[in-house]
Amino acid sequence: MNIDLMKLTVDYGILGILIFMGFVSLFFYIERLFFYKNLDEQSYSKKDLLEIELTNNTSIIASIASNSVYIGLLGTVMGILITFYEMGQTGQIDVKIIMTSLAFALKATALGLVVAIPAMMFYNHLVRKIEVKLALWQIHNS
């Protein structure tokens, strides 16, 4: 087992993916806000077409919100695996080393939560805006 490769995977792979997911969710949230601000819902003759336009890219934000926690958990599990492997290889149980390694392993879960919580807030905010836009269209077209 190549421990150095696993450490790099956790540090750059898992954490890099989580940071990227955070930027993607923020980008699509801002993009949707600009789209909703400039949208004239009355220019749509069919409600389904309006709904398709309104919900575009929201599933990406929802997927990021739900999956970033699991990606963070994967990083933590890999970090704990590395800690136990290194303990087994050295044959020594040093509490300082174990606690430091476990603390670094938990950073992946923490980052996963840091990405997931705002993404879920973004998604819920957009869903509310979608409901309002659809209701306004319904009021004007019924």
Which ranges hold each PLM region?
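Hydrophobic alpha-helical transmembrane segments of small proteolipidic membrane proteins, enriched
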Residues: 1-134
